[in-house]
Amino acid sequence: MASSSPRRQELLKQLGLEFESYAPEIDESVQYNETVEAYVERLAREKANTILQQFPQSIIIAADTSLSIDGKIIGKPESKQHAFDIWSTLSGRRHDVFSGICVAASNAIHSCVVKTSVEFQTLSMADMELYWATGEPLGKAGAYAIQGIAAQFIPRIEGSYTNVVGLPLFETIQLLKRVKAFN
């Protein structure tokens, strides 16, 4: 697996797959005029290709997750203020979570993008302060973890729950089947 994300590792373990995890080093900068869909798919493919070069006989799973609201790509918070800015934007609104998934093997590379719409309740400054104090928002796209404390802020989603966690399992299995790595 081309990821050091504990959440992605936990999700893959649910499938009963044996795997090793490697963190690829790639440039995650957004390219000029790049859509969120193109961005997450490009990063997933770059991550997979980077690790496949090191382990050419392996099957590599890679993913990247970002949010989009008002046409803007929202990644991980860089500071407390950045997290608060993100939450202020998400507060009381719907946003979309996109994951690019790539499964790469020596004979084939397949990828796709999955979208889930997430509704956030209106957050007070006290909500934001308390949530920040938990440490949970760090390292998470959109500065929240749907599988954790932030679940209390999300009344509904439309689409794949595991996509919002960071690895849409249904689509991952479909890609593994395409490279004949899953029955």
Swiss-Prot record:
Alphabetized Gene3D superfamilies for the sequence: 3.90.950.10
Lineage: superkingdom: Bacteria
InterPro entries in UniProt: ITPase-like_fam, Maf-like
Annotated catalytic residues: D64 (proton acceptor)
Compartments reported by the entry: Cytoplasm
Documented EC number(s): 3.6.1.9
One CC-aspect GO term: cytoplasm
Main location: cytoplasm
Cofactor(s) the record lists: a divalent metal cation
One matching Pfam family: Maf
GO biological process, one term: nucleotide metabolic process
Marked site positions, Important for substrate specificity: R7, T65, Q147
CDD domains, A to Z: Maf
Swiss-Prot/TrEMBL catalytic activity: dTTP + H2O = dTMP + diphosphate + H(+); UTP + H2O = UMP + diphosphate + H(+)
GO MF annotation: an example: UTP diphosphatase activity
UniProt keyword terms in alphabetical order: Cytoplasm, Hydrolase, Nucleotide metabolism
PANTHER family listed in its UniProt record: BIFUNCTIONAL DTTP/UTP PYROPHOSPHATASE/METHYLTRANSFERASE PROTEIN-RELATED (PTHR43213), BIFUNCTIONAL DTTP_UTP PYROPHOSPHATASE_METHYLTRANSFERASE PROTEIN-RELATED (PTHR43213:SF5)
Matching HAMAP family: Maf
Family in the record: Belongs to the Maf family. YhdE subfamily.
Protein name (Swiss-Prot/TrEMBL): dTTP/UTP pyrophosphatase
Source species of the chain: Acinetobacter baylyi (strain ATCC 33305 / BD413 / ADP1)
Lineage of producing organism: Bacteria, Pseudomonadati, Pseudomonadota, Gammaproteobacteria, Moraxellales
